[in-house]
């Protein structure tokens, strides 16, 4: 089939690893903790808030600080946007270590292709520091 090819390129998130829902889970837990259980978002609600913020502010640290400021205002959360962002980052690192796993068959396929001497590449928009946690 494709095994005669010498190089394979894989997308990371959602293809090799099942990480797409983890960001909504991070935001759910962040809101629960910061509000002492007063704010309980569904995974869909958390995802919608984050996606809306990224569409409004773009990507990058500044966008996430603005997103944290929005959450602070909307839900009357304690702390500065910077403090909330730091807590989100810490929580995300924990979730990435403990909740993100290879998709079924992905690890075996990578090992098989490597054993065949194929060149492998991974592409992603994920920040390197998060990839290192996976």
How does the language model describe each region?
Residues 2-104, 112, 116:
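N-terminal helical cap/lid subdomain that shapes the substrate entry/recognition surface
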């Amino acid at each position: 089939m494709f095994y005669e090819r010498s190089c394979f390129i894989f997308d990371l998130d959602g293809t090799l690893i099942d990480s797409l829902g983890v960001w909504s889970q991070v935001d759910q837990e962040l809101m629960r903790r910061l509000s002492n259980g007063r704010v309980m978002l569904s995974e869909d609600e958390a995802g919608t808030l984050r996606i809306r913020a990224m569409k409004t502010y773009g990507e990058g640290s500044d966008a996430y600080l603005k997103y944290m400021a929005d959450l602070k205002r909307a839900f009357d959360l304690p702390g500065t946007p910077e403090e909330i962002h730091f807590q989100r980052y810490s929580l995300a690192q924990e979730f990435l270590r403990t909740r993100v796993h290879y998709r079924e068959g992905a690890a075996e396929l990578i090992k098989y292709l490597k054993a065949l001497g194929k060149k492998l590449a991974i592409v992603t928009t994920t920040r390197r520091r998060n990839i290192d946690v996976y």
